Amino acid sequence: MTDETGVTRKAYPTDLSNEQWALIEPLIPPAKPGGRPRGVDLREVLNSILYLHRTGCQWEMLPHDLLPKSTVYEYFALWRDDSTLTAMLAALRGQVRVQEGREPTPSAACIDTQSVKTTEVGGEQRGYDGGKKIKGRKRHLLVDTLGLLLAVVVTGANLDDGTAAPQLLSRVTAEELPRLTVIFGDNKYHNHSLNAWLAKHRPQWTIEVQSPPAGTKGFSVVRKRWVVERTNAWNGRSRRNSKDYERTTASAEAMIQISAIHLMLHRLAPDDVPVTFNYRASTVTPITVAA
């Protein structure tokens, strides 16, 4: 791939197209005044992050024709900690909603959780979800009715959904979501302390519990809540999200945000060029197995 920066290499399927880069480049904070001029190609930084995110590789296993781990992780940590990823998420979400014929901000949202296993690398906030029999972490998601991410919090899997809800809802303000009035959730959010928190901190918002029909056994798709399950499926397209591989919950939350950012970039600027994979070189003779 050759772009205006002079970088030349073979393109990866996760690389940003020119149209996608034009959408996200203005959302990257400029370099701080003073000091040396920025010498890093930020498009390649994003390409490297997206490659790691989609393939699930380790930081040290980034291909040699992408940027080195030290550079990529430095920007990942910077954008994670200075809320750049959160700002990208909000800006792109508003554009996608307008493209879909909606207002830039939602009037309704959905809240739910997903428990995922962690790995042996260690890290903070791990626990056991007795209901789902999973040892690891829990992803608390707030999405709009299109399934677009509004906020995410990652905790130990043992933390009750209703108990963690104020932490999740505090990630967004009434000023950021001025039209929001109702949040759909399941019975776990029928919680006195949660309602008390809402009355004090977010009086404009109410939780509306959506339950399966009486007598339903096992999993049941519930209207107005199923969009969160679809969002979980979108997140699962990236191997980095197949488990929680991160040492910190901040990095785990950032990986969910990156899923949403990548999804919305493809919604706004679809990549219509098919990627061809050559799984077998033309010079390789197929092996014939005798019957």
Label each region the model flagged.
Residues 1-291:
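Short alpha-helical elements
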